[in-house]
């Protein structure tokens, strides 16, 4: 696990984009993408770039259950607004949060991941150490699955909604075992509220109580943090 400290989120996005360009030069074809505030500066760099992404495939980590793709809080909408509308890909995959059978949708998504191995996976990290929507207690062996969101996650995500009551209580998420199959992982974290999770991820025991701790076992993880998020690493 390599730690890169940056001045701010803007610099973090630039570093992540440089890593992506290196990966593309080596033949990467499938990107694993995340939502939330952490990767936005990275997506801004992608949008500003003259690079053409139309031969790439993207696979997103997760989607809320019960939200239409037209909802401005859906992750499908987020990705279109922040990246896909400006930079078309060959194919974009996200879980279908309105699937009639969400368990079957999870299995369908696993098949997509199997057919498109992820070369470059972007991650954020939750205050409780979650990656994707894999909450504390999630089995490291889990693949794509339906998640009951913890109160801390609902509270953290409520800033994007009119009220906390509007935040969905479930999501479909790529599992930890799925994430660990990625050839390269770039995790972005900014702000003091992420410091405890980053410390546990880097130095703590590998435990399902802190899902991101499993990344210690991955061969190629780069963590990009500002000084606030890295404040407990010294």
Swiss-Prot record:
Biological process, per Gene Ontology: carbohydrate metabolic process; glucosamine catabolic process; N-acetylglucosamine catabolic process; N-acetylneuraminate catabolic process
InterPro entries named in the record: Glc/Gal-6P_isomerase, Glucosamine6P_isomerase, Glucosamine6P_isomerase_CS, NagB/RpiA_transferase-like
EC number: 3.5.99.6
Pfam family, one: Glucosamine_iso
Pathway terms, separated by semicolons: Amino-sugar metabolism; N-acetylneuraminate degradation; D-fructose 6-phosphate from N-acetylneuraminate: step 5/5
An MF annotation (GO) of this entry: glucosamine-6-phosphate deaminase activity
PROSITE patterns: GLC_GALNAC_ISOMERASE (PS01161)
Enzyme class: hydrolase
Gene3D superfamilies linked to this entry: 3.40.50.1360
A single GO cellular-component term on record: cytoplasm
SUPFAM superfamilies in UniProt: NagB/RpiA/CoA transferase-like
Catalytic activity annotation: alpha-D-glucosamine 6-phosphate + H2O = beta-D-fructose 6-phosphate + NH4(+)
Cited function: Catalyzes the reversible isomerization-deamination of glucosamine 6-phosphate (GlcN6P) to form fructose 6-phosphate (Fru6P) and ammonium ion.
Protein name per its UniProtKB record: Glucosamine-6-phosphate deaminase
Gene: nagB
């Amino acid at each position: 696990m390599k730690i890169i400290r940056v001045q701010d989120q803007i610099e973090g996005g630039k570093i992540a984009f440089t890593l992506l360009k290196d990966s593309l030069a080596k033949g990467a074809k499938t990107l694993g993408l995340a939502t939330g505030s952490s990767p936005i500066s990275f997506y801004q760099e992608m949008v500003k770039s003259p690079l053409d992404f139309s031969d790439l495939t993207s696979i997103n980590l997760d989607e809320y259950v019960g939200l239409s793709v037209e909802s401005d809080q859906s992750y499908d909408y987020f990705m279109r607004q922040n990246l896909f509308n400006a930079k078309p890909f060959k194919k974009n995959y996200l879980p279908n949060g309105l699937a009639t059978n969400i368990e079957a949708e999870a299995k369908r998504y696993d098949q997509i991941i199997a057919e498109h191995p992820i070369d470059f996976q972007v991650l954020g990290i939750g205050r409780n150490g979650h990656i994707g929507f894999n909450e504390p207690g999630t089995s490291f062996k889990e693949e794509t699955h339906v998640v009951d969101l913890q109160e801390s996650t609902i509270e953290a995500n409520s800033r994007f909604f009119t009220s906390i009551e509007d935040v969905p209580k479930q999501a479909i998420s790529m599992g930890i075992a799925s994430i660990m199959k990625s050839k390269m992982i770039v995790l972005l974290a900014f702000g003091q509220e992420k410091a405890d999770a980053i410390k546990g991820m880097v130095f703590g025991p590998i435990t399902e109580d802190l899902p991101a701790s499993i990344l210690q076992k991955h061969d190629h993880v780069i963590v990009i943090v500002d000084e606030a998020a890295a404040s407990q690493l010294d």
